[in-house]
Amino acid sequence: MRDKIRLVSSAGTGYFYTTDKNKRTMPEKMEIKKFDPVVRKHVIFKEAKIK
């Protein structure tokens, strides 16, 4: 079952990506390093719920 999630920047800019993940194979919270165009750097994005 794939659920939609939101990846929020840890730089505190409020920038986020939306994606989906398979909760059966990956039950823990996702953390991935991606580009944040507001600070123009690669930072860690953490999983949050889509409101």
From Swiss-Prot:
UniProt entry keywords in alphabetical sequence: Ribonucleoprotein, Ribosomal protein
GO cellular component: a single term: cytosolic large ribosomal subunit
InterPro entries referenced in this protein's UniProt entry, alphabetically: Ribosomal_bL33 (IPR001705), Ribosomal_bL33_CS (IPR018264), Ribosomal_bL33_sf (IPR038584), Ribosomal_zn-bd (IPR011332)
Gene Ontology annotations of biological process type: translation
Pfam families: Ribosomal_L33 (PF00471)
GO terms of molecular function: structural constituent of ribosome
Superkingdom classification of source: Bacteria
Gene3D superfamilies: Ribosomal protein L33
UniProt similarity note: Belongs to the bacterial ribosomal protein bL33 family.
NCBIfam families reported for this sequence: PRK00595.1, rpmG_bact
Protein name: Large ribosomal subunit protein bL33
Organism: Idiomarina loihiensis (strain ATCC BAA-735 / DSM 15497 / L2-TR)
Gene name of this polypeptide: rpmG
